[in-house]
Structure formats: C-alpha cells, structure tokens
From Swiss-Prot:
Family: Belongs to the eIF-6 family.
Annotated localization: Cytoplasm; Nucleus, Nucleolus
Keyword Protein biosynthesis (UniProt): yes
Pfam families the record matches: eIF-6
Keywords: Cytoplasm, Initiation factor, Nucleus, Phosphoprotein, Protein biosynthesis, Ribosome biogenesis
Gene designation per UniProt: TIF6
Species: Candida albicans (strain SC5314 / ATCC MYA-2876) (Yeast)
Any GO CC annotation of this UniProt entry: preribosome, large subunit precursor
Cited InterPro entries: eIF6 (IPR002769)
The protein's name: Eukaryotic translation initiation factor 6
GO biological process: assembly of large subunit precursor of preribosome; cytosolic ribosome assembly; maturation of 5.8S rRNA; maturation of 5.8S rRNA from tricistronic rRNA transcript (SSU-rRNA, 5.8S rRNA, LSU-rRNA); maturation of LSU-rRNA; maturation of LSU-rRNA from tricistronic rRNA transcript (SSU-rRNA, 5.8S rRNA, LSU-rRNA); ribosomal subunit export from nucleus
Amino acid sequence: MATRTQFENSNEVGVFSNLTNSYCLVAVGGSENFYSAFEAELGDVIPIVHTTIAGTRIVGRMTSGNRRGLLVPTQTTDQELMHLRNSLPDSIKIQRVEERLSALGNVICCNDYVALVHPDIERETEELIADVLGVEVFRQTIAGNVLVGSYCSLSNQGGLVHPQTSIQDQEELSSLLQVPLVAGTVNRGSSVVGAGMVVNDWLSVAGLDTTAPELSVIESIFRLQDAQPDAIGGNLRDTLIETYS
C-alpha cells in the first residue's frame, strides 16, 4: 500500500516520521490527517509513537532504526528516552549515539540487514550501528552525495535512490544491499527521496505532492501492491489452512 499525506503543509514526510517493520515514530503536534495516514494502515499492527527528539519535531532526520533497534542522538533528553522505552516493544534496543553528525537519519540509511552510512561517520558509531541494528555497515555516497539517508529510501524489498545516480552506481549499490534499486523522485520531482517519504515492507507514505507515476514507481520497487504485514499475512495463512484442511 502506498499513500500520500502532509505534515502542516510540508511534504517532507520522512523528516517528521520514521517507519520500520516493528514501530513508527511521528512528530508531536501536526495535523490529524498526518497521523490518520499511518493509523489507518498500522494501527493494529505496530505501535505508533508520538515523540520529540532532542526537543525537535524532526524525528525522521534525528533517528535511524530498523525492526531490531533505534539509534537516537546524544542530545535526546532522559524524558524522551524514557517515553520511547515505555512505548516501544521490549525487544527493541534503544541506544544514544555520541556522533558529531548528529542528524542520524541524514547520515544512515538502513533496512533490517544492511546500512549505508556517511563516509566520515565515527568508527564507534559504525560499531554501534552494526551491534544495535544487527546489520552490515557500508560507507558510501549516493550520486556523489554523502548524506545517504537523505538521498536513499530503503526497505527489505527494494530501494529508491537519487535520480542522478548512474547505472553503474545503482548496480554496485544493489549488489551491496542485495535488493533491487531504482533512481527516482518523490513530491513532484524532489531528489531528496529519504526525506520525502518513509517505507517498510508493506506500507509507504510519501508527500501529498507525489505524482501518480512517482507513486507507481514506489509501489513497484518496494513490492507494495499486495504486501501484507507479517503478522496479518501469517494469521491469514493459518485461517486459510484451517478452512481448507
């Protein structure tokens, strides 16, 4: 399922939210439409946590995470950390990261298996990413840009990268990540795909300006046409097996 929404007239959905296969963070405040886009699809499946990070609402740019863990900058307050710990499943590791490049969502792009990171990220941060998120870490650029989290959107099914990424780069990144990639845009031609949308294995939410062709590229590369959350997919399969056995 691919949908569109806005956060207080901003189409940069990936700035104000962070979506994984086991939880979703959204900024506090904002309009009801923004939350209902997530709640309609995720409400019964994974927790949706309203929070600030380091006193700001740009939760998607300040954090990076996957189904195993969540990394937050060292400026995150104790109160915010406590709120996250209380709201997220116990299996999720939450870790403060002492990193000069503190907008972690801009410098890390990850799914449940691999992470692309800014070439200049600290060695300790690289180790934390591997440890907390349980992923292989690669220092990379995308179309010459060091902000890999801003110019790439990634799930376990596929990835969307900066429109100027060369075919050679796409093939190289695709073999590193072991998922198909396509170069494209969101929000009617914006190359900042990481900030313009969020995606997990069954849902993508992009900005309201995203055109129908852009949305169909998103649905196709992330294989969202008939994707179901694991929990629901499993239940349906069991029900069908019982019905026909």
